[in-house]
Amino acid sequence: MTEYSLPTMNLWNNSTSDDNVSMMEAFMSSDLSFWATNNSTSAAVVGVNSNLPHASSNTPSVFAPSSSTSASTLSAAATVDASKSMPFFNQETLQQRLQALIDGARETWTYAIFWQSSVVDFSSPSVLGWGDGYYKGEEDKAKRKLSVSSPAYIAEQEHRKKVLRELNSLISGAPPGTDDAVDEEVTDTEWFFLISMTQSFVNGSGLPGQALYSSSPIWVAGTEKLAASHCERVRQAQGFGLQTIVCIPSANGVVELGSTELIVQSSDLMNKVRVLFNFSNDLGSGSWAVQPESDPSALWLTDPSSSGMEVRESLNTVQTNSVPSSNSNKQIAYGNENNHPSGNGQSCYNQQQQKNPPQQQTQGFFTRELNFSEFGFDGSSNRNGNSSVSCKPESGEILNFGDSTKKSASSANVNLFTGQSQFGAGEENNNKNKKRSATSRGSNEEGMLSFVSGTVLPSSGMKSGGGGGEDSEHSDLEASVVKEADSSRVVEPEKRPRKRGRKPANGREEPLNHVEAERQRREKLNQRFYALRAVVPNVSKMDKASLLGDAISYINELKSKLQNTESDKEDLKSQIEDLKKESRRPGPPPPPNQDLKMSSHTGGKIVDVDIDVKIIGWDAMIRIQCNKKNHPAARLMAALMELDLDVHHASVSVVNDLMIQQATVKMGSRHYTEEQLRVALTSKIAETH
């Protein structure tokens, strides 16, 4: 991805004119309510300074890391300070990390800032300064276009536009002009993000400083908590409409995220920050995949690399990934992109490489230019040795200021961002008429603003030299084509030719080329394997072939268990049916109820019988007290035989004329209740002869 970073020289050095300094002092000392009053933000600086050992004690600066460099391409200005320490991470990927963090999150974040930790003096604590930033904007920005006509609101907007124009004039060296692109509304969150460049925090002060000092994340959500915070920056953010501010420390600084929505604390976000911003693991050397729902041609605050980075025809040296340069032109790409009705749907901004003799490379800094361009560039890598930046125009708002009359360099075949599309006179006039008719294009593409503060070379695959005709190898991010914006403007948007075949399902993004389609297919396949691994209990190995084999074995085991369960179920059903049939079978009618004591006259004598029965399951305990005459023991055995009762134990004892019999029996074909068995025995034993 071709990116440009803010210069590493102090913008507000002694060479700045008194008029410029006075203008910036007035800019910083504004009496409006959106300026913070703490010491870290009251300094009259807006520049970027990474030369920390030379930072002034009374002029705090915003610190930014510079990119790694090759010794063969160091400029003279970059080698003046021999004590400058080498960077420890790749600045090119820092912008991609911030963009991937916001665009890949489930929550809706408005901006992300990386505060870099630097040491100004060995005896003083570390200082957090501006390292990089990415502004996504608010989803409902197009819906909340308020027609506010109050004098205070108009005065505030005029002040912001004036400051931006004068800031551009100060940096570019051109007289302030009336660029109509600056007349666009500068929202509160955009303004808060811009003025964050001027802030720095000592370790332990402010919300980022507290997060770095305590090495623990700080999550402030809710308007009441923001307003009650002791940090001036947090209260300032609440005044600008933010509802959630998060500061997560990392090894080299603090990542700050803000949102206009109320977002609860999420451990996934903190883990993602720790992974993305762990520079010690050399994660910065790779390219980050573009999120499907985000536009990779997000707009950047960029610095086109200057003399230390340009590709010279006279030098046949191969450039490394990134080259620090103290001399560069600063550009801000801000707003949405315009749809281009041409066939290929792309437009190229002209980038100018300043060619200066070696004896002129030691000057403080080149003329800088703030360009709020109407187009964003997609960061696609350069081919065939040229440095032309391929850009995708889209519809949206335009803020464009800065001098756009730079000349193109003859050797590099590139131009400076001029804010004018290279379409033709007719399309140029049409774009001018459509500047003010911006419409909402989507939540993730509305009002994006991104800042890079380091010097970054385009992708490592770019070849230098005049005869570089080889195509460089690119990552998936660099090779993928930016998705076409769906615009609802009155002008008919470009109809990109699509391949024949089935239409994608509702809500599914159609891949733009085979590389993106293959990536989506592999990602989908990996997700399915992850889900399969989660449900298979015994995984022998972690490779996909073993996982499939274990899944097959597990499925076969489940099938066998299912078959066994079905057979057991059938057996239980058959047993239940048999019991039901047996219960429906009518048994012998029970004998009529009789008293426990029955009297019958036999030859003028009365026979008294007392029977006690206890039932336990299919077993019964019987105890009988009666007269010993007429052989009651024999009659009991006969009754037990007739009732189909098996005798397990029996005892007979006689006391005078009373016989006591005890028996333990087991019921056979029929189950009797206590009452039924007692009545049956009474009728058998009490019979008279």
UniProtKB/Swiss-Prot annotation:
**Which spans does this entry mark as compositional bias, Basic residues?**
496-505
Q: In which tissues is it expressed?
A: Expressed at low levels in roots, stems, leaves, flowers and fruits.
Annotated ranges, domain bHLH: 509-558
The main place the protein resides is nucleus
Compositional bias ranges of the Basic and acidic residues kind: 471-495, 506-519, 566-585
Annotated spans, Helix-loop-helix motif: 523-558
**Subcellular location, in the record's words?**
Nucleus
A Pfam entry, by short name: HLH
Q: Where is the composition biased (Low complexity)?
A: 350-361
Misc note: Plants over-expressing MYC2 exhibit increased number of branches with reduced internode distance. Plants silencing MYC2 exhibit increased susceptibility to infection by the fungal pathogen Botrytis cinerea. Plants silencing MYC2 show decreased susceptibility to infection by root-knot nematodes.
Q: Where is the composition biased (Polar residues)?
A: 316-349
Extract the ranges annotated as region (JAZ-interaction domain): 94-172
Function as written in the Swiss-Prot or TrEMBL entry: Transcriptional activator that binds to the G-box motif (5'-AACGTG-3') found in the promoter of the jasmonate-induced gene LAPA1. Acts as a negative regulator of blue light-mediated photomorphogenesis and positively regulates root growth. Promotes growth in response to the phytohormones abscisic acid (ABA) and jasmonate (JA). Binds to the G-box motif (5'-CACGTG-3') of the RBCS-3A gene promoter. Acts downstream of the jasmonate (JA) receptor to orchestrate JA-mediated activation of plant responses.
Q: Which GO terms describe its cellular component?
A: nucleus
**CDD domains associated with the record:** bHLH_AtAIB_like (cd11449)
* UniProt cross-references to PANTHER family, sorted A to Z: MYC (PTHR11514), TRANSCRIPTION FACTOR MYC2 (PTHR11514:SF43)
| Gene name of the record | MYC2
Q: Does the record's keyword annotation contain Ion transport?
A: no
- Organism in which the protein naturally occurs: Solanum lycopersicum
Segments of this protein annotated with the region Basic motif: 509-522
Protein known as: Transcription factor MYC2
**Molecular-function GO terms, alphabetical:** DNA-binding transcription factor activity; protein dimerization activity; sequence-specific DNA binding; transcription cis-regulatory region binding
Q: Which GO BP terms apply?
A: defense response; positive regulation of DNA-templated transcription; regulation of DNA-templated transcription
Q: Assembly state and interactors? A: Interacts (via N-terminus) with MED25. Interacts (via N-terminus) with JAZ7. MED25 and JAZ7 compete with each other to bind to MYC2. Interacts (via N-terminus) with MTB1. MTB1 and MED25 compete with each other to bind to MYC2.
Induction annotation: Induced by methyl jasmonate. Induced by wounding. Induced by infection with the fungal pathogen Botrytis cinerea. Induced in fruit by storage in cold. Induced by hydrogen peroxide and infection with root-knot nematodes.
Q: Where do the segments described as Disordered lie?
A: 316-361, 420-519, 563-602
Sorted keywords for this record are: Activator, Developmental protein, DNA-binding, Growth regulation, Jasmonic acid signaling pathway, Nucleus, Plant defense, Stress response, Transcription, Transcription regulation
